[in-house]
Amino acid sequence: MRIVVIGGTGHIGTFLVPQLVALGHEVTVLSRGRRKPYQSPGSWTRVDMVEVDRQAEDERGSFGELVAGLGADVVIDLICFTEDSAGQLAEALEGRVQHLMHCGSIWVHGPSASVPTREDAPRRPLGEYGTGKAAIERHLLGRARRGGVPATVIHPGHLTGPGWVPINPAGNLDLAVLQDLVDGRRVTLPNLGMETLQHVHAADVAGVFLEVLAHRSVTVGESFHAVGAGAMTLRGYAESVARWFGRDADLAFLPWDDWSQTVSEEDARITWDHLSHSAHCSMDKAARLLGFRLRYSPLAATAEAVAALIESGRLPGPDLEPS
């Protein structure tokens, strides 16, 4: 099949695109051309790369027709964040593709009510990002269930893998938190460190996309989680990272109002986003309908990311030997 991947050089595309090529598909990747994949096996030489500014094309109302004009059988959209953008694309692809797959987010759920959260749980999104993703899901699946563009939405957890910084045990991207755990220094966590994170390796997210592609008859009009098996508490995550380096984590705790004054405004914002969701979503639907099995646990996914940071020199430390 001819497959167009929008935003295919990022976290998910790095793992997804080479597998699509290996399966014999003709792949075109649309991107701004500003970033190379985190890993570049030889199969990328067989990918047709098209440089395009989606935001500019959306503002002109031309992006959907640009994609439709490529004559794809399947379109995989990894970088859509507004209902208007999704609607333009879906309208242009109506009757012209076999499948449209959209990358959503588990943040469509908002704060957890009962865990593990299933795909059919009521939507109570928080903030602009989660609200936007929930609106896109409602729009695309509504179209699909009315016989319109055949769409599926895949909701990843906290994307993790070699090449970028994982969400750390404080719920943000500050490398100093990981460095302090490596070196045995005290790390202060918000509240009691019992809020949860649900990391997932980008390779596993790519795997869900591949299974959705292979099971079109049961995936059109549906959403699927793409998350690691189980969630980690901030405290448990910190203790595990310390153990990788033969240490017992030296942890302290502060109420949110006090803790947030000890970090930058940006780190506090990111942490609050993660704490307020405390995600713990189920993978049962993908296992039951698609036969999907995860390759990485959340902890193994973050271990690989941290190991890559050490290898690259971005995180000074000994060789990582997770226990």
Model-derived segments and their meaning:
Residues 105-128, 142-147, 164:
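Active-site "gating" loop of Rossmann-like NAD(P)-dependent oxidoreductase/epimerase domains
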Residues 147, 161-176, 212-224, 247:
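Glycine/proline-rich active-site loop of Rossmann-fold NAD(P)-dependent oxidoreductases
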Residues 177-200:
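A conserved pocket-lining segment of Rossmann-fold NAD(P)-dependent short-chain dehydrogenase/reductase
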Residues 270-323:
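C-terminal amphipathic/interface module of NAD(P)-dependent oxidoreductases
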